[in-house]
Amino acid sequence: MPSSYDRVSKNYRQSELDKFASFTSGWWDPHGPQKPLHALNPVRLDYISKRVSLSGARVLDVGCGGGLLSEALARQGAHVTAIDLVPELIKVARLHGLESGIQVDYRIQAIEDLLAEQPAPFDAIACMEMLEHVPDPAAIVDACAHLLKPGGRLFVSTINRTLAAFMLAVVGAEYVVRLLPKGTHQYKDFIRPAELAAWLRHAGLHLEDVSGMRYEPWRNRARLTARTDINYLACAISPEASHATE
């Protein structure tokens, strides 16, 4: 019976790809348009590195954008494969890799296509600020589960579907403070932790942790918090070998 990950290369919205293609300018400028991502990146890296030994690990970065997290993971000694469907962002990532000397295997590829290649399974998979931008996020989670080694971990960051998230992540960030371009996020696509937990269970993964993540624009810094009503991080583990090899 075909499963959700058999829908190869169909799980995207062209409008989202076009939108992110327009975000390439200044991607690696910590004071530029992607300033919030630069502030979030150390928090994301620390969250991952406390749960996975990165030195020598095989890591997949799904929806890698211009490579901020990909390079940070590689600097910790991980062997990183990074995929995105926006050619302009992969070009940015590759060019920066040439400048930095950090080796990452960047690919213009959907995770469903990568899964179809049946690569060696990964020790860890990162899917950061990506699930809220695809029409079928549960299928992404399912594909990630099938690409993990037994005992491998999936790391997700996304935005909760709450009034607080709408007011701060959409109205505040896009229209008041203008930290992000208008239209970056759609409230209806935000994901409640309970929804993510259900997708993880269905994919055969065990949810280990959910932690809130808060960006403070007045200080341009981010931190973990007990509150998950806006941004949050989650970690899930694959307990069965079948999920990495089927």
From Swiss-Prot:
Name under which the protein is recorded: Ubiquinone biosynthesis O-methyltransferase
SUPFAM superfamilies on file: S-adenosyl-L-methionine-dependent methyltransferases
CDD domains given in the database record: AdoMet_MTases
Catalytic reactions on record: a 3-demethylubiquinol + S-adenosyl-L-methionine = a ubiquinol + S-adenosyl-L-homocysteine + H(+); a 3-(all-trans-polyprenyl)benzene-1,2-diol + S-adenosyl-L-methionine = a 2-methoxy-6-(all-trans-polyprenyl)phenol + S-adenosyl-L-homocysteine + H(+)
PANTHER family with a match to the protein in the record: METHYLTRANSFERASE, UBIQUINONE BIOSYNTHESIS O-METHYLTRANSFERASE, MITOCHONDRIAL
Keyword flag S-adenosyl-L-methionine: yes
A GO MF label: 3-demethylubiquinol 3-O-methyltransferase activity
